[in-house]
């Protein structure tokens, strides 16, 4: 079987297509956004491959796996088990890091446990096992005549009553033991609590230190070591003298610091054996941040410098008034004019000083009470800790920030794990290195003799995995980077690297635009990785718009000709030459150069007086960057992956602007020195790829605000007025007009254990979401359900006489979404589509010409033709006087920009500098810029 046969695929918008796909080849599926590429790749081929594999398992195993819906297809032959690597961002678990996802960290733990050298944290000397004679000598160094006892640890911090243990010790002839620090008689031991942790140490010998004790001590040590498994404690019998720990395992000769045998879990921050006890292995501590609590330091306490403690909140404000009387300050003085001492007292409390507070109840009775003032920060902490209301907790969480844990300095590990070294390098140092530097470290690491032999296999696994990460262009990440902070493209390429590491053969991989977020420079390495997967003997199916990927494919499938209802057919298939030769293929026309995105004749000139100047940005890897953005221009921020684009624009510039222009209270920008020029804008809008709604009830009509005027139109018809229907009657989210059998969903979810949940159309409303009475109301001959089922294109014509609706529909068409249905569930929109719905919503708002738009990789999921449409929209925004800032790798976008800011020169620590800025023509001349190298040929 050397091909996959697909017959009659009708998933989503696919129009009963038949396909023959070669196996063990690199296949690229391309076409307009929304043409049906993902429906073919993910919802048909992957879903069926996955479903068949899962159905071969037992019913018991199936209940733990999420099953795919059976695709609407007549039959598929020649499928392999399928693995999909999608754009979904990875886990939201704060414990997930790049190291743990890629399994590199597991091998590092094993390596450190097997060949690491533990050291004493205080004296930095290697921990060595002590012989009995060394132990005896150490005891004899104590002052002559000291009364000491020698103890063997039998139970350490373990729950239970330990009756048997104590009986055994007595039977062996031991008389006394120390239990939880108290000495007691073994003939009558205390009863221990079952659910508490206990430590039991048996007293092997009691002696006064004398020089002739050698023989006796040696025998006692031998007995004790045998009982305890290698650790003996020598403690004074009277007073609080210091105890000495001796170890036949590992111990520091200076201070007796010792530790148990090294094992991999000691280096895991997800295991109590290795996690820092202060932060539980998270590396950060949460605290109420004064900068967030103080809303505006220029205001006085009475005016609301601290939200929730102003005059409107009588209970809390009377506390501040009493505080002001006691310390003699004025609640009407601006907060930043109060002395440092007073500010400290307000935030952190009055310590032990008691203050007289007046409490007035509802009846107006006054009660006087004297007690210390707890401080606003402690008050918030207490309320956060004690509340059972989620809404209160969410509200208070806005004032919380994270700081590196004070005990482990953010390394997440216990002190023992932080002090194990391989050639003077500890594990936390390695996970902080970039992946490229870590690879160099392990390639150059030289171990001696037996250690080299033990480490050989583990090192090979570590090197291979790091090499794969470098190959997919992630050399700039470090292993300790939290998975939450990765972009969709990075997360996908990490999963890709893990798959190559698995080395499977005969599998069908389905990938969704792996080139997202990758600079042209790194694209080549990614494509080599894909061909490597193919050469292992796998079928690699890639949904991709990148020209290099299409040209490199063994087989290209072009889906189209349009998007949505106008798509769903195979327009062209074959190798690249066949696609180019096919006159029907839009992709072919762009590849051959018949159609192309032109370089603009002239660019909008920069007005030197109108710029935004951000100085001294130092977030993440930024090296004191000064950013200057021209107002009223279309600016592209470029640079290799990891060079600092997102940190500079999203984490610093956008958050400052969001706070200053939109009044956001919880956006904390990355550190910077100063900013000037925001007065040129009245608002800032950030348009990203996150979903527009996570429930099937959210749809383009509700999101863009078209649904409200549509419901008002229906409520205004003669029929509605005679029945007394309000606009709410036409909402499927509230009781009244919706079908109650399915609560306005149109479908009913039937849970099938062991099989995927089945959604069946509701029998009562036949999937129309509304009850019969509501559907009797028609506007221009259409019911509300028929309107929701219209495509944007049809609705634009239908509502042409209604300007408020027509304008919003026109903007949806302008961003290339003419094919989506008004009532289409938000969960079925791709990332690129969701971003364009957001863009359309912003475009349809009244345009002041003073808006700052920030877009992060808007070309994700877009075909050449879609990019052309997107650019005309962005250029239109700019022509109205707005400022557009785009983070982008796509050269078609970069070459049409008015201004480019290029970061680099490399990713990670090798980046964080602006290395070129100016018009595309200026930037193309700069040698140091990787972007320039690829941009230059396109401008000539």
Swiss-Prot record:
SUPFAM superfamilies assigned: P-loop containing nucleoside triphosphate hydrolases (SSF52540)
Cellular location(s): Cytoplasm
Q: Which GO terms describe its molecular function?
A: ATP binding; ATP hydrolysis activity; DNA binding; excinuclease ABC activity; zinc ion binding
Query: According to its UniProt record, where is this protein mainly located?
Result: cytoplasm
Q: Which InterPro entries match?
A: ABC_transporter-like_ATP-bd, ABC_transporter-like_CS, ATP_grasp_subdomain_1, P-loop_NTPase, UvrA, UvrA_DNA-bd, UvrA_inter
Per UniProt, which keywords does this protein have? ATP-binding, Cytoplasm, DNA damage, DNA excision, DNA repair, DNA-binding, Excision nuclease, Metal-binding, Nucleotide-binding, Repeat, SOS response, Zinc, Zinc-finger
Please provide one cellular component term from the Gene Ontology annotations of this protein.
Answer: cytoplasm
Query: Disulfide pairs?
Result: none
User: Which residues are in the ABC transporter domain?
Assistant: 309-586, 606-936
Q: Where are the zinc fingers (C4-type)?
A: 252-279, 739-765
Q: Which PROSITE patterns match?
A: ABC_TRANSPORTER_1 (PS00211), ABC_TRANSPORTER_2 (PS50893)
One BP term from GO? SOS response
Record: residues binding ATP: 31-38, 639-646
Q: Which family does it belong to?
A: Belongs to the ABC transporter superfamily. UvrA family.
Subunit structure of this chain's protein? Forms a heterotetramer with UvrB during the search for lesions.
Its job:
The UvrABC repair system catalyzes the recognition and processing of DNA lesions. UvrA is an ATPase and a DNA-binding protein. A damage recognition complex composed of 2 UvrA and 2 UvrB subunits scans DNA for abnormalities. When the presence of a lesion has been verified by UvrB, the UvrA molecules dissociate.
Can you name this protein?
UvrABC system protein A
Q: Which organism is it from?
A: Vibrio cholerae serotype O1 (strain ATCC 39315 / El Tor Inaba N16961)
The gene designation is uvrA
């Amino acid at each position: 079987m050397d091909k996959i046969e697909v017959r009659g695929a009708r998933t989503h918008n696919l129009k009963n297509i038949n396909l023959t796909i070669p196996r063990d080849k690199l296949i690229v599926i391309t076409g307009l956004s929304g043409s049906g590429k993902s429906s073919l790749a993910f919802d048909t081929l992957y879903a069926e491959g996955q479903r068949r594999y899962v159905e071969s398992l037992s019913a018991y195993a199936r209940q733990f796996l999420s099953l795919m819906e059976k695709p609407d297809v007549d039959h598929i032959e020649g499928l392999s088990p399928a693995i999909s690597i999608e754009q979904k961002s990875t886990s939201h678990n704060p414990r997930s890091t790049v190291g743990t996802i890629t399994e590199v960290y597991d091998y590092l733990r094993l390596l450190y446990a097997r060949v690491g050298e533990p050291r004493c944290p205080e004296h930095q000397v290697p921990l060595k096992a002590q012989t009995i004679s060394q132990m005896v000598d150490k005891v004899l160094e104590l002052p002559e005549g000291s009364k000491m006892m020698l103890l063997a640890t039998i139970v350490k911090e373990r729950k239970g009553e330990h009756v048997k243990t104590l009986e055994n010790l007595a039977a062996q002839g031991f008389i006394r033991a120390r239990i939880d620090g108290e000495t007691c008689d073994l003939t009558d031991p205390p009863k221990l609590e079952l659910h508490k942790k206990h430590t039991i140490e048996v007293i092997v010998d009691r002696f006064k230190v004398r020089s002739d004790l050698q023989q006796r001590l040696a025998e006692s040590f031998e007995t004790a070591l045998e009982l305890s498994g290698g650790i003996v404690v020598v403690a004074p019998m009277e007073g609080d003298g210091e105890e000495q720990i001796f170890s036949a395992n590992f111990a520091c000769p200076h201070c007796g610091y010792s530790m148990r045998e090294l094992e991999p879990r000691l280096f895991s921050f997800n295991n109590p054996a290795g996690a820092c006890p202060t932060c539980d292995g998270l590396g950060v501590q949460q605290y109420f941040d004064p900068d967030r609590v103080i809303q505006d330091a220029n205001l006085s306490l009475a005016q609301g410098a601290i939200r929730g403690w102003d005059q409107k909140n009588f209970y809390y404000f009377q506390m501040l008034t009493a505080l002001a009387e006691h310390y003699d300050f004025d609640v009407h003085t601006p907060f930043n004019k109060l002395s440092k001492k007073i500010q400290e007292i307000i935030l952190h409390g009055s310590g032990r000083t008691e203050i007289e507070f007046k409490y007035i109840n509802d009846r107006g009775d006054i009660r006087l009470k004297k007690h210390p003032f707890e401080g606003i920060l402690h008050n918030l902490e207490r309320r956060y800790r004690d509340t059972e209301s989620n809404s209160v907790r969410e509200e208070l969480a806005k004032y919380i920030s994270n700081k590196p844990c004070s005990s482990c300095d953010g390394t997440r590990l216990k002190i023992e794990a932080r002090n194990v070294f391989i050639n003077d390098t500890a594990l936390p140092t390695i996970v902080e290195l970039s992946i490229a530097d870590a690879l160099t470290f392990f390639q150059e690491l030289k171990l001696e003799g037996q250690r080299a032999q033990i480490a050989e296999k583990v090192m090979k696994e570590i090197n291979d995995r790091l090499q794969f990460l470098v190959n997919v262009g992630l050399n700039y990440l470090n292993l300790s980077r939290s998975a939450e902070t990765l972009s969709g493209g990075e997360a996908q390429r990490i999963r890709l690297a893990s798959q190559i590491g698995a080395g499977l053969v005969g599998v069908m991989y389905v990938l969704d635009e792996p080139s997202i977020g990758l600079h042209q420079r790194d694209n080549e390495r990614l494509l080599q990785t894909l061909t490597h997967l193919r050469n292992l003997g796998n079928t690699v199916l890639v949904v991709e718009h990148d020209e290099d990927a299409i040209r490199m494919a063994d087989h290209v499938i072009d889906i189209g000709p349009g998007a949505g209802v106008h798509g769903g057919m195979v327009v062209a298939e074959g190798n690249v030459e066949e696609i180019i030769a096919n006159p029907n293929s839009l992709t072919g026309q762009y590849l051959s150069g018949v159609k192309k995105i032109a370089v603009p004749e002239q660019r909008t000139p920069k007005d030197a007086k109108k710029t935004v100047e951000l100085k001294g940005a130092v977030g993440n890897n930024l090296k004191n960057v000064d950013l200057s953005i021209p107002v009223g221009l279309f600016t592209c921020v470029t640079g290799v992956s990891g060079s600092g684009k997102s940190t500079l624009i999203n984490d610093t510039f956008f958050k400052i602007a969001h706070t200053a222009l939109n009044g956001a209270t919880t956006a904390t920008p990355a550190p910077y020195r100063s900013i000037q020029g925001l007065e040129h804008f009245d608002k800032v809008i950030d348009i990203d790829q996150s979903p527009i709604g996570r429930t099937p009830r959210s749809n383009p009509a509700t999101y863009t605000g078209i649904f409200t005027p549509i419901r008002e139109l229906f409520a205004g018809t003669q029929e509605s007025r005679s029945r007394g229907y309000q606009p709410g009657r036409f909402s499927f989210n509230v009781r009244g007009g919706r079908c109650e059998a399915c609560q306005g969903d149109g479908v009913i979810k039937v849970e099938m254990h062991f099989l995927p949940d089945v959604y069946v159309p509701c029998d009562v409303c036949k999937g129309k979401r509304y009850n019969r009475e509501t559907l009797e109301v028609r506007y221009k001959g259409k019911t509300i359900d028929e309107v929701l089922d219209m495509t944007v294109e049809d609705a634009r014509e239908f509502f042409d006489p209604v300007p408020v609706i027509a304008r919003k529909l026109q903007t949806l068409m302008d961003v290339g979404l003419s094919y989506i249905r008004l009532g289409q569930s938000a969960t079925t929109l791709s990332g690129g589509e969701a971003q364009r719905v957001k863009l359309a919503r912003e475009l349809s708002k009244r345009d002041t010409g003073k808006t700052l738009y920030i877009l992060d990789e808007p070309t994700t999921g877009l075909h050449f033709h879609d990019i052309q449409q997107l650019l005309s929209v962005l250029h239109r925004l700019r022509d109205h006087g707005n400022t557009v800032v785009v983070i982008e790798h796509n050269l078609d976008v970069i070459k049409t920009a008015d201004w480019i800011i290029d970061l680099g020169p490399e990713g990670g620590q090798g980046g964080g500098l602006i290395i070129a800025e100016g018009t595309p023509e200026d930037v193309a001349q700069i040698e140091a810029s990787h972007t320039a190298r690829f941009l230059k040929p396109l401008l000539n």
